[in-house]
UniProtKB/Swiss-Prot annotation:
It catalyses: alpha-D-glucosamine 1-phosphate = D-glucosamine 6-phosphate. NCBIfam families: glmM, PRK10887.1. The modification Phosphoserine is found at S102. GO terms for biological process: carbohydrate metabolic process; peptidoglycan biosynthetic process; UDP-N-acetylglucosamine biosynthetic process. It comes from Parvibaculum lavamentivorans (strain DS-1 / DSM 13023 / NCIMB 13966). InterPro entries: A-D-PHexomutase_a/b/a-I, A-D-PHexomutase_a/b/a-I/II/III, A-D-PHexomutase_a/b/a-II, A-D-PHexomutase_a/b/a-III, A-D-PHexomutase_C, A-D-PHexomutase_C_sf, Alpha-D-phosphohexomutase_SF, GlmM_bact. Pfam families: PGM_PMM_I, PGM_PMM_II, PGM_PMM_III, PGM_PMM_IV. The keyword Metal-binding applies. Its EC number is 5.4.2.10. This is Phosphoglucosamine mutase. It is an enzyme of class 5 (isomerase). The keyword Phosphoprotein applies.
Amino acid sequence: MPRKYFGTDGIRGTANTGHMTAETALRVGMAAGRVFRRGEHRHRVVIGKDTRLSGYMLEPALTAGFTSMGMDVFLFGPLPTPAVAMLTRSLRADLGVMISASHNSFEDNGIKLFGPDGFKLSDEVELAIEHHMDNGLADNLAGSRGLGRAKRIEDAQARYIEHVKHTFPKQQTLEGLRIVIDCANGAAYKVAPEVLWELGAEVVTVGTEPNGFNINEDCGSTAPERMCAAVLERRADIGIALDGDADRVIIADERGKVIDGDQIMGLVARHWKEMGTLSAPGIVATVMSNLGLERYLGSLGLDLVRTQVGDRYVVEHMREHGYNVGGEQSGHIVLKDFSTTGDGLIAALQVLAVLKAGDKPVSEICHLFDPLPQLLKNIRFKRGEPLKDKDVQEAIREGESRLGKTGRLVIRKSGTEPLIRVMGEGDDEKLVTSVVNDIAAVIEHNAA
């Protein structure tokens, strides 16, 4: 069934236009309240947000929707997405809500929903919410005495900080390490430096001065250049870059070289296998992960299981088949022993645990394999379905034929932005570049 509001990661769009308005947020709150208001107990929902200006608009609208359906609302303020997921379970809430557009610029915002178990909602539940958003909400309003209340939870950040610290080996500290942490002027701007400081590190901060407009602006995991420069300038041991809602992480070694999610997953898989804590003979990643990771894991006797793009699909497969390590090349790392969704800070602590356990620099620990040449191009379009065009389909078939068995193509429509993503990968870099550029040119021509 086609979706009207939800994409691959909740509802997302440009703030105060289209589906990302106060009116839509009100209806999301009412509809989700309708779906999750079950039984006779006092119902509650928790709401967190990142640092975007539009969060001030969406938070009260959602609160109004939920309270009108008789649900109490606990407000966290700026807090990472994985913290909202964790606190949904910890506070025995019926539903968790994160207001964020993740790695997007401040103009965008989004609404992510978590069930009482802390996991993102299934497609079926999201479709049920969509149905109620457009059908008869007024018939299910709470009575005058049954309205919900709203309360701000002052210690939400402290609760999450303690949770994250407990994922780090008790016998270790971060003393002696100089760490650059880039918080993308986002949701983790307070909690991430505090965690590292409390564990004993010397902390150098980047992107910790949000103003409502500068989230992800030339900083964070999608723009790690400032973090890398700070590592070199301050002679740090490691750099850590989170995105706007801190569910992604990218690492930099002491030379300022970037280490992506594939390398991080490989490191955690190897370490957990050695520790005997890997719950399955492999990990779960998406079709975007580099073939180099697959070959490296194979050398360890481990499998790489691929899903479609989106950390929710990675998590679904992990839950169904018993895996406890998974994620995406972009830095969504899901460690199911500790969290129900991607948690950039917890993933970074696992890298730091390996670093502290040995006497080698990050450059020797984290560069596990040489990735195959890979090129990703994003083509923006205004309307329609460019991938259904006959010329585009023919260009894709020709590209697949040219690559043959030496490479692969992944071409898909983004679930969060009006983009077509064209990714090519293979042993021959020149061939990969040529194939991707040719396909991108045809898409650009037909999407103009």
